[in-house]
């Protein structure tokens, strides 16, 4: 039996043990993981340095190297995240609803772990810690499959987690790493229906699209973020500029940053030049349609491809429209159903936007940067779902649970 199948089989076995563990036992294990990460920081950083050196030799970009890099402070941040996770309410065992039937049957809908979670992701070794600890908190076993670029870091982190779990009542194989980083191992994970209950991809559009297209295992899709902000005719000028600057420039490489601004032509004629100047002062490259170019000749003419691109950089597309209907059509045509916003003082238009735009998170007079588990008050988050089944938006702890019905009677039979 090869590595992927063997670890899948073992994960299924361990899941039956893990479901019996109490919240106290799971929290003890999380505390042990946090302590062990601090205790073995030097070892983790040494292995991470190998990934960085290999990445430099392969010509990785500075942004990719930054995503790969671990530092003492980043490991401290990971452990602080685990401590916050310990404080969160455990959803497992929660009664979602209960009722009694006329025949005396008492019915409860209870939260239970999903079972075995597969996680396939790129570059960031911090995802190894996030996924492992969130799954432990929710009573799920997890099979991690990171990228070859972070293999030394991921192996070190999982080894540290195993040493921590050995000190607790939780099986160390609650967390397993697929060390084979070839495409064959990924493809095998896609079709492990006998062992995996769900597969969660985290990474770029190409990875996510590949998993969605090829996996027969149920997938929780954490989609790309081609996010828009529509500035309506009635939008407050300074509010609009401040929100656009924040949503684009605070952290341009994240999925909840905007990639296109859609401007009502009347607002653009009055305030567009000031908005464009503010963006260009911050190093933003603007790519617009012909109506945008008529307002500012320094804007580069956008291609059809630009409207559907998640730039993840200081590049921003600009679309000028004559109505809210045109804005909604553009957003629904090119958006990725992640986060979309309207800046407006017209409540009728806001209501129309909220009803008509298809996305996981919709904003009125606020930045799309708030689409995040911690900002929503969920605490930990394993990703942001852009699909409609099971869960949508930031996936907090309840997203890693399912439900079962528990029915209590006193001898009832169906007539």
Swiss-Prot record:
Q: Which domain of life is it from?
A: Bacteria
Gene Ontology molecular function, alphabetical: glutamate-5-semialdehyde dehydrogenase activity; NADP binding
Keyword rRNA-binding among UniProt keywords: no
Query: What GO CC annotations are associated with the protein?
Result: cytoplasm
Q: Which PROSITE patterns match?
A: PROA
Per UniProt, subcellular location reads as: Cytoplasm
Enzyme class, spelled out: oxidoreductase
- So what EC number does this one have? 1.2.1.41
Q: Which Gene3D superfamilies match?
A: Aldehyde Dehydrogenase, Chain A, domain 1, Aldehyde Dehydrogenase, Chain A, domain 2
Q: GO annotations under biological process?
A: L-proline biosynthetic process
Q: Which Pfam families match?
A: Aldedh
Identify the InterPro entries for this entry. Answer: Ald_DH/histidinol_DH, Ald_DH_C, Ald_DH_N, Aldehyde_DH_dom, G-glutamylP_reductase_CS, Glu-5-SA_DH, GPR_dom
Keywords (alphabetical) are: Amino-acid biosynthesis, Cytoplasm, NADP, Oxidoreductase, Proline biosynthesis
Q: Which reaction does it catalyse?
A: L-glutamate 5-semialdehyde + phosphate + NADP(+) = L-glutamyl 5-phosphate + NADPH + H(+)
Q: In which pathway does it act?
A: Amino-acid biosynthesis; L-proline biosynthesis; L-glutamate 5-semialdehyde from L-glutamate: step 2/2
Q: Which family does it belong to?
A: Belongs to the gamma-glutamyl phosphate reductase family.
Q: What does this protein do?
A: Catalyzes the NADPH-dependent reduction of L-glutamate 5-phosphate into L-glutamate 5-semialdehyde and phosphate. The product spontaneously undergoes cyclization to form 1-pyrroline-5-carboxylate.
* Name recorded for this polypeptide: Gamma-glutamyl phosphate reductase
The organism named in the record is Bacillus cereus (strain ATCC 10987 / NRS 248)
Taxonomy of origin reads: Bacteria, Bacillati, Bacillota, Bacilli, Bacillales
